[in-house]
Amino acid sequence: AVIAAQKKRLGTKRGFIAVKSNCSIQSYVPALSPFRADFGLDKILVCTYQAISGAGKTFKTWPEMVDNVIPYIGGEEEKSEQEPMKVWGRVENGVIVNAEKPLITAQCLRVAASNGHMAAVFVSFDKKPSMDEMKARWAAYKGRAQELGLPSAPKLFLRYFEEPDRPQTRLDRMNEGGMQISIGRLRPDTQYDYKFVCLSHNTLRGAAGGAVELAELLTAEGYITAK
């Protein structure tokens, strides 16, 4: 519906613009999506720990980041709070209307990792699921890419680790070619219902790989066709 309205506005027959969401939300938005319909998301606090490749840098080109953490990424906190509302929104008359809930507050830090964005998530629900229900939802969740069997889509989209020290950036960012979301450390919280940690590969899932998957989706849905 958005693409059709966009083509009408632009006056194009075939061409259109498709965008993907910011790399900072790639881990925690998929991890929370399985619960929206049945449990409702009330409020979320998220702290992201983002690799230097997200700034287009390496340790060679950004030596100041070696053995360092910078507690500021320009514009990232605003995007991390606002973009999920668009992702979880609805389309009306060719326009995306943002979701009204959940309330989101974010803090984004640049850390000394080459690739991989990690997020510490605190969440409260309208209707609180059990921890077993959450793990079961993660294991069973399929996005549109899995339903269509797209070439770049991970077979298991969301993977939960029972080990207390997982996921780890070095060990888990390349799971399923860097396209899988890794989740761990689910436990009750004193201020929110639960807290957990999740990890995504920011330049694969969050950027280039996600863009390829988007092109595959648009092709499968008939928006991109051969001349």
Give short role names for the model-derived ranges.
Residues 109-112, 200-205:
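Glycine-rich phosphate/pyrophosphate-binding beta-alpha loops
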Residues 1-65, 69, 101-103, 175, ...:
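N-terminal Rossmann-like NAD(P) cofactor-binding subdomain of oxidoreductases
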